[in-house]
A protein has these predicted regions:
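Short hydrophobic/aromatic patch on the recognition helix
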Residues: 66-75
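Amphipathic alpha-helical packing segments from all-alpha helical-bundle domains
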Residues: 139-164, 171-178
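Secondary-structure edge/capping motif, primarily at the C-terminal ends of alpha-helices
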Residues: 121, 163, 187-192
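Hydrophobic alpha-helical connector segments
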Residues: 91-131
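C-terminal peripheral helix-coil segments that are non-catalytic and often amphipathic
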Residues: 1-22, 158, 193-219
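A secondary-structure capping/hinge motif
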Residues: 79-81
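Basic, helix-initiating cap at the start of DNA-binding domains
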Residues: 1-50, 54-66, 83, 92
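Hydrophobic/aromatic residues within well-ordered alpha-helical segments
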Residues: 35, 85, 89, 114, ...
Length: 219
């Protein structure tokens, strides 16, 4: 997947010391990440050139200059080659909820995350539009994306419940997670016709925020 995930630059809350910078990855971790990126880049290039179903695993391994064994260590199934940032995407999504500034609602935090992600996609890898077309036109990738979407929804719903003091199986948490993840797609569809994707995204999350306030305000 083209890199569209923004890196967090949120300041520390007023009066709080800045969070310590994470330790830089070691040589082994850097090499592993570079290999994974090389495999994913080679796979996406071949998929966009020839189509997902017409490219074999061995061809991808050869293009990335790795063995098929190494490829499968990083990507256990072929579909995962397209969604190589799945874990990072989920981690950033959960962090948007758990690390939001004091006083910011969960829907507002998810709105800001969605807006940052949209800006990064608009100014990021030019292959992103082609990537979306590849997923939409390939049944195996659509199915994998749907399963990934459901996993992200469940993980986000758990984080929302924990942050809001609600039961883990509260349907309101699942509903918020569902619509928060669906909002960018709905806003983009609106924007494709009317040309105001950002405004549509803000309005959608404003609606979610208003509804969420009625839930959290209950005794």
């Amino acid at each position: 997947m083209p890199d569209t995930e923004p890196r967090s630059t949120a300041p520390a809350p007023d009066g709080a010391p800045p969070a310590p910078a994470p330790a830089p990855p070691g040589r082994r971790e850097r090499k592993k990440a570079a290999t994974r990126r090389a495999i994913a880049d080679a796979a996406l290039r071949l998929f966009l050139e020839r189509g997902y179903d017409d490219v074999g695993i061995r061809e991808i391994a050869e293009a990335a200059d790795v063995s098929t064994t190494t490829l499968f260590k990083h990507f256990p199934v072929k579909e995962a080659l397209v969604f190589d940032e799945e874990a990072d995407l989920e981690a950033h999504l959960i962090a948007a909820v758990r690390e939001r500034p004091p006083g910011r609602s969960v829907p507002a935090a998810l709105r800001e995350h969605a807006l940052r992600h949209r800006r990064a996609a608009d100014g990021g890898d030019p292959r992103f539009t082609a990537f979306l077309g590849l997923v939409d036109s390939t049944p195996a990738l659509r199915d994998y994306h749907q399963a990934m979407w459901l996993r992200h929804t469940a993980a986000l719903a758990r984080a929302v419940a924990e942050e809001s003091g609600l039961a883990a199986d509260d349907p309101a948490c699942t509903a918020l997670a569902h619509f928060a993840l669906e909002a960018p797609r709905a806003a983009q569809a609106h924007g494709d016709v009317h040309g105001d994707t950002r405004e549509a995204l803000i309005r959608t999350f404003d609606l979610l925020d208003a509804g969420w306030q009625t839930i959290t305000a209950r005794p």
